[in-house]
UniProtKB/Swiss-Prot annotation:
GO terms for biological process: angiogenesis; cell adhesion; cell differentiation; extrinsic apoptotic signaling pathway; positive regulation of axon extension; positive regulation of extrinsic apoptotic signaling pathway; regulation of angiogenesis; regulation of wound healing. It is a single-pass type I membrane protein. TNFR-Cys repeats lie at residues 36-67. PANTHER family: TUMOR NECROSIS FACTOR RECEPTOR SUPERFAMILY MEMBER 12A. Its main location: membrane. InterPro entries: TNFR_12. Residues 102-129 are cytoplasmic. It is found in: Membrane. Residues 1-27 form the signal peptide. Associates with TRAF1 and TRAF2, and probably also with TRAF3. This is Tumor necrosis factor receptor superfamily member 12A. Receptor for TNFSF12/TWEAK. Weak inducer of apoptosis in some cell types. Promotes angiogenesis and the proliferation of endothelial cells. May modulate cellular adhesion to matrix proteins. The chain crosses the membrane at residues 81-101. The gene is Tnfrsf12a.
Length: 129
């Protein structure tokens, strides 16, 4: 009886492999695989792909289990909020740049020395006359 077990193991494996091949040849869907595009799921009852958008109206349909969670709704205010925030940042940057420029310009008036004695290009005689 102990010698029958090793001989029957290959037979069981071959039988199991044959069943898998027959199931694949019959066209049945293996669990976890789907020939459907995104947004749709395979219905075993109807034997075709069904749109997941109909699941809120009929949540107990067999294909709704294959649909992912409801897709997130589009946030319609995203672009106006993003545009407003970027505009605010731009305005604040311009105002702060103007204030810094104005402050530096006020200090700049007294930092430029005025040449009172003349230079090499201006003789001292010309200053006296």
């Amino acid at each position: 009886m102990a010698s029958a077990w090793p001989r029957s193991l290959p037979q069981i494996l071959v039988l199991g492999f044959g069943l898998v091949l027959m199931r694949a040849a019959a066209g049945e869907q293996a669990p976890g695989t789907s020939p459907c595009s995104s947004g749709s799921s395979w219905s075993a009852d109807l034997d075709k792909c069904m749109d997941c958008a109909s699941c809120p109206a009929r949540p107990h349909s067999d294909f709704c289990l294959g649909c992912a969670a409801a897709p997130p709704a589009h946030f319609r205010l995203l672009w106006p909020i993003l545009g407003g925030a970027l505009s605010l940042v731009l305005v604040l940057a311009l105002v702060s740049s103007f204030l810094v420029w104005r402050r530096c310009r006020r200090r700049e008036k007294f930092t430029t020395p005025i040449e009172e004695t003349g230079g090499e290009g201006c003789p001292g005689v010309a200053l006296i006359q």
